[in-house]
């Protein structure tokens, strides 16, 4: 977010909490959003509908080379915390196409991209997928999960439980 503000020529010391909330707008995790949202020109245009393979290549470019060309896009989809790069994406029912914005018949998913900076490297996704399957076998209720098998990596994805079409669902997790 700070990089986007700098790119717009705004000094960070002058950015208010309201400016930051307007930037997040309707793209926040969970059930809360903020209105009015920043203009489309400021926050960027919607991703073209692309395949997960291309998105994964872009994520690797960001986290290994800090490529500015794709940083802006991935910054908008990666609003969740944690040590691994993630994307909050919407996928077609067959999971072949994705977009950062809701589309009719697309569902919300969180995808965890691979990194080379951890012990497991490209096997992180496989491990998390196995953990999810074990949790389901143990009777723990989880949203749908998927393992994307790409040419050079396997990515874990979990369907969002706080979205239904364009509706946000409030969930209190203890």
Where are these regions (language model features)?
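Phosphate/dinucleotide-binding and metal-coordinating scaffold of catalytic cores
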Residues: 1-174
């Amino acid at each position: 977010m700070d990089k986007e503000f700098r790119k717009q020529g705004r000094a960070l010391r002058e950015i208010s909490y309201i400016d930051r909330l307007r930037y997040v707008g309707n793209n926040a995790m969970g059930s809360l959003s903020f209105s009015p949202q920043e203009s489309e020109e400021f926050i960027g245009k919607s991703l073209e509908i692309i395949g997960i393979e291309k998105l994964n290549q872009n994520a690797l470019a960001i986290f290994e080379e800090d490529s500015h060309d794709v940083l802006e896009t991935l910054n908008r989809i990666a609003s969740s915390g944690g040590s691994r790069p993630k994307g909050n994406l919407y996928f077609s029912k067959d999971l072949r196409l994705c977009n950062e914005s809701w589309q009719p018949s697309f569902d919300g998913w969180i995808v965890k991209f691979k990194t080379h900076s951890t012990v497991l490297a490209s096997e992180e996704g496989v491990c998390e997928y196995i953990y999810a399957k074990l949790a389901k076998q143990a009777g723990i209720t989880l949203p749908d999960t998927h393992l994307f098998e790409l040419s050079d990596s396997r990515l874990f994805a979990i369907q969002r439980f706080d979205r239904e079409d364009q509706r946000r669902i409030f969930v209190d997790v203890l």
